[in-house]
Amino acid sequence: MPRVNLLNYNFNALVMLVCSYLVLFSEVEISTNVFFVILFSFAVIQKSFNYKYKKLFSSILAIATIYILFVLNDQTLSKEYFINLILGLIFLKYSEIEKKENHYFFGFSCVFLAVSSLIYGQDLISSFLSFIIILLSIIHLYSLNQTK
């Protein structure tokens, strides 16, 4: 039976990514959820490949993500748009992680999303998931600083 190792920073990053999506799952429309699932799938697949122009491709996709989320939010700049934008950019940042040093910005972005979600959404499930993200981020940063 496989054991869950909370000090494995790659596993923590994936769990934080899933929790980040689940925080906003109930607060966005179906079309935005479909876009997030596609972006999540892309992030997981791209992280597994290592090719030369990964950051360039992610940058182009980030610009497209900003535009697509703007259109999905009825071309309105609102707090929902910016919180959705943070989640989209977290997905793209996860796909760019290659080295241990790249995990720091990802962890801080997840904490920012969790705190923003706590301010924006006050339901119990969202608050619990935000707490899980913050707790996992602390464990994640601790495991990144460990030397073996």
Model region roles, listed by residue range:
Residues 1-148:
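Linear, non-domain "peripheral" regions
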